[in-house]
Curated annotation (Swiss-Prot):
Keywords: Membrane, Transmembrane, Transmembrane helix. It comes from Dictyostelium discoideum. This is Transmembrane protein 170 homolog. The keyword Cell inner membrane does not apply. It is found in: Membrane. Belongs to the TMEM170 family. GO terms for cellular component: membrane. It comes from the Eukaryota.
Length: 128
């Protein structure tokens, strides 16, 4: 398998439900699985925080749009943060000739999202 082919993610995993079974062994597929789950969890958590903010600021004329903007922001953060972290994890898995099973991809993506959310939402408490 040429190196260039291993960098192209096989997007069939997103469309035929293969993110829920099987193993990933190519660089692009591992990256796609981890980035996808990190983005999903981050987007959902930012959407929930947007609904909370919209409820708290319900007298504002922009309050109905807050969840939309926070979800878009969460998606951008999930893609960037998850993409960079998944790049490193993919390199480790490919260079070590390991297989990434479907549930390990979910665990890595959700774990990365939780680490980011802990740092994002406890930022004021962690400052010295």
């Amino acid at each position: 398998m040429p190196f260039r082919d291993s960098l192209q993610p096989d997007t069939r995993y997103l469309t035929d439900g293969s993110l829920f079974h099987g193993y990933f062994y190519q660089y692009g597929d591992i990256w796609l699985a981890i980035t996808f789950w990190c983005t999903v969890v981050t987007t959902i958590s930012y959407l929930i925080s947007g609904f909370v903010a919209s409820f708290v600021l319900k007298k504002s004329k922009f309050s109905p749009f807050i969840p939309i903007f926070t979800a878009m922001y969460g998606m951008a953060i999930g893609i960037c943060y998850g993409g960079i972290s998944a790049l490193i994890l993919s390199a480790i898995y490919v260079s070590g000739s390991f297989l990434l099973s479907w549930y390990q991809g979910i665990i890595c993506g959700v774990g990365l999202a939780i680490v980011h959310l802990l740092f994002a939402f406890t930022q004021g408490k962690l400052q010295v």
